[in-house]
Amino acid sequence: MSPPAAIFEPAVAPSPSLKAKVLVPETVPASGTSQTHLLDHFGGKWDDFKFAPIRESQVSRAMTRRYFQDLDKYAESDIVIVGAGSCGLSTAYVLAKARPDLKIAIIEASVSPGGGAWLGGQLFSAMVLRRPAEVFLNEIGVPFEEDPANPNFVVVKHASLFTSTLMSKVLSFPNVKLFNATAVEDLVTRPSASGDAKDTQIAGVVVNWTLVTLHHDDHSCMDPNTINAPVVISTTGHDGPFGAFCAKRLVSMNTVDKLGGMRGLDMNSAEDAIVKNTREVAKGLIIGGMELSEIDGFNRMGPTFGAMVLSGVKAAEEALKVFDQRQRECAE
């Protein structure tokens, strides 16, 4: 179940430059109607204001106790999503809503989840999504603008509005845990009965603090931790320091012969190809988003986000198709 939305009076404010209309009403707090009546509660009382007393060790214990409860709970997960960009978060949203019984762990190397979806292209703030990706915006309640003269795409006034809304919904699900500032260093594997590396079963991920991962070359060895899961979904983006990690690891494991390598920018070709081909590329490992372009040699798409969102939807669908079978195989 989605978390309850804050109740505000709607105020529609489309961008005049786009000659647009907002198809999902924007919501801003109306003066004097704050749901929590914060000014009524605190206003004019600051001279007597005081926080409840606390001892520093209470904070340390509460914080670490809660975190280690999550570590213990999600050490055996049902699905692990690697990468919390627009594709990974969309995947998590669909999965958590469809299957509240599944434990879903999201691993994100950065302190701040969201990947490149905090801004549009070239550090511009607006986000463009080609139709029919606006269906997902309606699903999560993100307002967007459309231009009647250009009906094939919609515009979100700030990419951060999309990312923050999606992230808040994902993290509100009780069956989802985000481990940020955490890097995936390797994959947990199981050999196939035939011994063929191409049939290797993926059975989880090997993790470490990102700061440790970044300094393996200049510090003494620091062993990692593990999370078991019958299905891993990798959405780490195109090649980079942490990008396309699982795709590259499949090659070094001989599960995939070689990477296709991302081609030049072609929005029309790239977005359709990424969504249609999001799939299980190895037993227990589904790859979506721009990471898939490194496997299959698809074009890059640049600053248009519809394929990232809908690749996430398809990744969730693919995961649900194979979950029961992969769970049985991993239990053997």
Curated annotation (Swiss-Prot):
It comes from the Eukaryota. One of its GO terms (molecular function) is ferrous iron binding. Belongs to the THI4 family. Signal peptide: none annotated. This is Thiamine thiazole synthase. It catalyses: [ADP-thiazole synthase]-L-cysteine + glycine + NAD(+) = [ADP-thiazole synthase]-dehydroalanine + ADP-5-ethyl-4-methylthiazole-2-carboxylate + nicotinamide + 3 H2O + 2 H(+). Its main location: cytoplasm. It holds the Pfam family Thi4. Binds 1 Fe cation per subunit. It comes from Aspergillus fumigatus (strain ATCC MYA-4609 / CBS 101355 / FGSC A1100 / Af293) (Neosartorya fumigata). During the catalytic reaction, a sulfide is transferred from Cys-221 to a reaction intermediate, generating a dehydroalanine residue. Homooctamer. GO terms for cellular component: cytosol; nucleus. PANTHER family: THIAMINE THIAZOLE SYNTHASE. InterPro entries: FAD/NAD-bd_sf (IPR036188), Sti35 (IPR027495), Thi4_fam (IPR002922). The modification 2,3-didehydroalanine (Cys) is found at C221. Substrate binds at C87, E108, A109, G116, V184, D223, H238, M290, R300, M301, G302. GO terms for biological process: mitochondrial genome maintenance; thiamine biosynthetic process; thiazole biosynthetic process. Keywords: Cytoplasm, Iron, Metal-binding, NAD, Nucleus, Thiamine biosynthesis, Transferase. It is found in: Cytoplasm; Nucleus. The keyword Iron applies.
